[in-house]
């Protein structure tokens, strides 16, 4: 039926289609809607995965990652901090994460391990990024790149570390009702 036939038959016209910007059909953000820092986290995750799985040299990983399509849209300074800071501080990051794990590191997916490194590193060193943003970004990374329920594990670990690493900020959010106690 054409629009004229719909009117003649007494049918209601279809409502105008809503414009959805920045989302895919599944509701995930399109690449174009991601911030430069979100992109930096994605590239850092890919690079950290190469480090954890292949034990590749950080300099080689860095050069390889910078040549990937879309890297020019990422915040290169944030990527550098996440990649090199996580690799250099791996032992300290693991020491903070380990008490919250219910299994050995060897049993954790390298994706979830790398996402937790990113989260803990940002909690400690990127104080300009609110803790809830760090947590949400890491959950989104785990959803996009990790296993089926990996994001829940990442959420539990990072949510457990947030009060320890960002005590004043978490407490202020809890007092204002922005975060659960």
Curated annotation (Swiss-Prot):
The keyword Transcription regulation applies. One of its GO terms (molecular function) is RNA binding. Belongs to the NusB family. GO terms for biological process: DNA-templated transcription termination; transcription antitermination. PANTHER family: ANTITERMINATION NUSB DOMAIN-CONTAINING PROTEIN, N UTILIZATION SUBSTANCE PROTEIN B-RELATED. This is Transcription antitermination protein NusB. Residues 1-36 are annotated as: Disordered. Involved in transcription antitermination. Required for transcription of ribosomal RNA (rRNA) genes. Binds specifically to the boxA antiterminator sequence of the ribosomal RNA (rrn) operons. Keywords: RNA-binding, Transcription, Transcription antitermination, Transcription regulation. It comes from Variovorax paradoxus (strain S110). The keyword rRNA-binding does not apply. It comes from the Bacteria.
């Amino acid at each position: 039926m054409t629009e004229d036939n719909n009117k003649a038959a007494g049918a209601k016209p279809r409502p105008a289609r809503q414009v959805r910007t920045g989302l895919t059909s599944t509701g995930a953000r399109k690449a174009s809607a991601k911030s430069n820092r979100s992109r930096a986290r994605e590239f850092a995750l890919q690079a950290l995965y190469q480090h954890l799985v292949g034990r590749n040299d950080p300099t080689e990983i860095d050069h390889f990652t910078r040549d990937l399509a879309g890297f020019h849209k990422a915040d290169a300074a944030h990527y550098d901090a996440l990649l090199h800071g996580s690799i250099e501080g791996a032992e300290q990051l693991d020491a903070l994460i380990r008490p919250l794990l219910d299994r050995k590191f060897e049993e954790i997916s390298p994706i979830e391990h790398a996402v937790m490194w990113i989260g803990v590193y940002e909690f400690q060193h990127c104080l300009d990024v609110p803790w809830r943003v760090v947590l949400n970004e890491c959950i989104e990374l785990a959803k996009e790149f990790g296993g089926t329920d990996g994001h829940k594990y990442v959420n539990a670990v990072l949510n457990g570390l947030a009060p320890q690493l960002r005590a004043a900020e978490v407490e202020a959010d809890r007092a204002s009702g922005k975060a659960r106690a």
